Structure formats: structure tokens, C-alpha cells
Amino acid sequence: FKELIDLANKHPRVNILQPGTGVGGHCIAVDPWFIVSEFEKETIIIRNAREINNYKTDWVIEKIKSTALQFELDNNRKPIIALLGLAFKPDIDDLRESPALQVAETLLAENKYDLLLVEPNLEQSDKYDLSDYEKLNGDADIVAYLVAHKEFKAFETETIELDFCGVKS
């Protein structure tokens, strides 16, 4: 999919953005629903777009779960999964309506996975036990990039990497 975006972006008037874990934040993820609620028939495309964007988060969750299952089958143990990035967009500390946070909360709620949550733009969290990405040092068996924070571009690991935000491209 990335190759198609790169090819299309060679055209001078095209700028397709890198898809991420989903659409988040306190505006874009929420405001369209106000319009849809008032003009239901006229806003079918807006409703469909939001539903598709919301589905992307579910797809990411399933991809992480299937990778974890394959790791477990191959190694006879559960993997440690590092989820890198919890904010709703790169290089901020705002978790409001964050699809990356939804991924983390869904996996935490299932209580089946050993998770390391990493958000370099937050020093601490009252709700989450955050790990320092610089100290992962091979602790994780699977690294899932959920948000393209600048810190993650140079992060190197020998483990399985799932890049959902284009930080490694």
C-alpha cells in the first residue's frame, strides 16, 4: 500500500498522507457526528468516511493480535508487545479521542497480553504504567508503532516490527 502512495505522490498536485492507526483528536474525530445527526440523508459520505476511519483501529488491533498469536505458536510463549505512541497525532501529548490509546485500552482490557505502553511526550500518567522507549533494550518481542513520533524514527530493534503509521518508511 505504501508503494502506491509513494507512486501517486510523484505527481506534483498529489499529496496522499500516510494512513495511521485511525483518526483522532477532539475535532476531526468528533465534529462530523454533529453534522450527521442534523442532516442524516445529506451526509451519508461523511458517515461512511467516519465508520471506515473507525474500522482502521479495529484492523490494527486484529493485526497485533494475529502477530502475537503467530509469535506464541512459533515460540511456545506469549510475546511482550510494546505499543509505541498513545497520542492522537505525532509529537504531542494529547490523548483525547486517540485511536492509538483505543488500541492500547482494548488490548489491556482483554488481559491476554504483556504490554509495554510508550508515550515519549508524557513523563507520567495517572492511568497508565508508561515505559521509556530508550530503555526497551530488547524487552519487547513485538514493537507496534501506533503514532509517528519523531523519537521513533531512529529507534532500532531486532524484534518483529508492525508499523501502522509510516514512521519507518
Regions found by a protein language model. Give the residues of each.
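Structural/interface elements that position substrates and couple domains in central-metabolism enzymes
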Residues: 1-169
